[in-house]
Amino acid sequence: MKGIVAITLVWGSISAFGQTRDFQLLRIAPNFISSPQFTYTGAQQYVADLRERWLEVEVTLAAAPEFSDELTVKYFILFNGKLLTGEVTHTNIPAGRENRSVIYVTPKTLQRLMLGRTVTKAALQNITVQLLQKGVIKDEMTLTRAPMQWYAAMPQTAGLTLNKNETPFAPLYWDRYLQVKTAR
């Protein structure tokens, strides 16, 4: 009987270690980028100020299920002492390790947060990203080492981040990013 219990305990621990997570964050890549430039006819064209930069936060994630109907990526961005929050809900998530989500902060918002000072990379203090499915956290990753849920006690500012479809980057690299779920 002791042998059966021992085998069961060993098998149970092996199977627990052998389980894979449905979703896993692999990388957080922040970048400061300029607005895309488009040429068109039929109206007056305006040149964007190429010195102004958007904050782009790209996340790479792995998905184990063949397809998932919905996955929410929640972002916590600490920029110049202000905690910005935003989320993007994706649909039709395929299995694989090259799935990407992205969120943006406009140049005007960054200028506002800098209180008139020049926007610098040093102002980006930290980023945490969570993957949620049906409200359950599936994974969490932080850009720089910090205590667990460092953002929880801080005042949060929502509404200052944009998903890709809400930016001038919407038509670019369509097949690089997961499909954004639209409200209907």
Language model features with spans:
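Short, compositionally biased P/S/T/A/G/V-rich stretches that sit at domain boundaries
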Residues: 19-50, 160-184
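Hydrophobic beta-strand positions in extracellular immunoglobulin-like domains
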Residues: 60-63, 77
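Short beta-strand elements
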Residues: 92-94, 133-184
